[in-house]
Amino acid sequence: MKHFAYSILGCLLLSLNAAFAQKTWSFDGQDPLLSSDGKSLLNLYTIKEIPEFVTGVEGKALRTDGYSTWMDTTTEGDVSSLSGWFALESYPTDTAAFMGIRDMAGTSVAVCVDRYGELLLGMGQNGSYSYCSLKTKVDRFKWLHVVLDLSNESVCLNGQRMSAEVWPRNLQDGEMILRVGKDFREKKVWMYDVTA
């Protein structure tokens, strides 16, 4: 399992249209999983005894591996975009996600990377999951600013906008799940989730 992507998350932003507000997590301070406004808590899932908080692009970062350490939270409102800073230490052995969002009907969209470093848009609906190439590769050991722009149906990498050839149907308004470090695809071996 050592060959999974090790992504390091430096800062995560969640823009909400409804309140014209922004949720920010920086992983600094006494409660690193609490948003800067003190209202939203990220749920951290890990098989490790102690999660690894390391030096990030600014402040602290959380080391994830695409399958055994990830975070999520539930949010209300019309989400317009997600953004975060990531760095890959290796490419994953299977497609892994930087971040994504899913509505309560099960429609999801995520920014992912494959075993060759190709950036992908991951889309899920009705229990099936597919990927669309964004026709760009990402480097290892470099900080990447990734934006999932739901309003404009595009992804931005370090300020460069990339449009996907396909995009999932619109997410339904209301409660949504934001996930970082793992996508919404389920892949199990016996009872164990091995989603990369």
For each feature predicted by the language model, list its residue ranges.
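Bacterial N-terminal signal peptides
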Residues: 7-15
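Short hydrophobic/aromatic patches on beta-strands that form ligand-binding or substrate-lining surfaces
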Residues: 25-27, 81-93, 99, 146-148, ...
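Short tryptophan-centered beta-strand motifs in secreted/extracellular beta-sheet-rich domains
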Residues: 142-151, 155
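Short surface loop/edge beta-strand patches of beta-sandwich-type extracellular domains
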Residues: 64-82, 132-137
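Flexible glycan-contacting loops in extracellular carbohydrate-active proteins
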Residues: 165-193
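Short, aromatic/His-centered strand-loop micro-motif at the edge of beta-sheets
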Residues: 123-145
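Glycan-recognition/cleft segments
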Residues: 97-121
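Extracytoplasmic low-complexity segments
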Residues: 19-67, 191, 195-196
